[in-house]
């Protein structure tokens, strides 16, 4: 119902995110693509990332960008979208069933197998208001303490910018020695 409401309100582009997990929903790749393409929505597959609170992520059970693309290619013709935003996390693909039938686009956020850290221009805010330069950052800034301490807007901007500038430009998720931050988003 939520998707229908957003669609009826005319909010576009409507993007639907899906995390495909081995032995859970691998069979949903093509039905999700069909649904989104039929309705003019942009589907974005996201590689499963080590974000859960119980540190249960297993790299060997992750469905990769290549596996998703291979499944999509069984039904669709995929052409890379070379006009996209270079800082966007998703790699976009133009999708068509055949040359006579217009398709749409599908994005894949492959933050594990094809990290985009070097071009990332994002910061994150945790549920309790801390600022991080990456989902996997171990350091945070606390703008609330600046506000509560009487700091100015410029002080907040300075702290936020400082956190963003310490971005290591590599989270190392796909490295053997990767350690998930103790505190999750």
What are these regions (language model features)?
Residues 1-46:
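Radical SAM/AdoMet-radical enzyme domain recognition
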Residues 13, 42, 120-122, 130, ...:
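Intrinsically disordered, low-complexity sequence elements enriched in Ser/Thr/Gly/Pro
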Residues 49:
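Active-site/acyl-donor-binding loops of N-acyltransferases
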Residues 52-172:
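Accessory C-terminal segments flanking Radical SAM cores
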Residues 175-185:
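Intrinsic disorder and flexible/low-complexity segments
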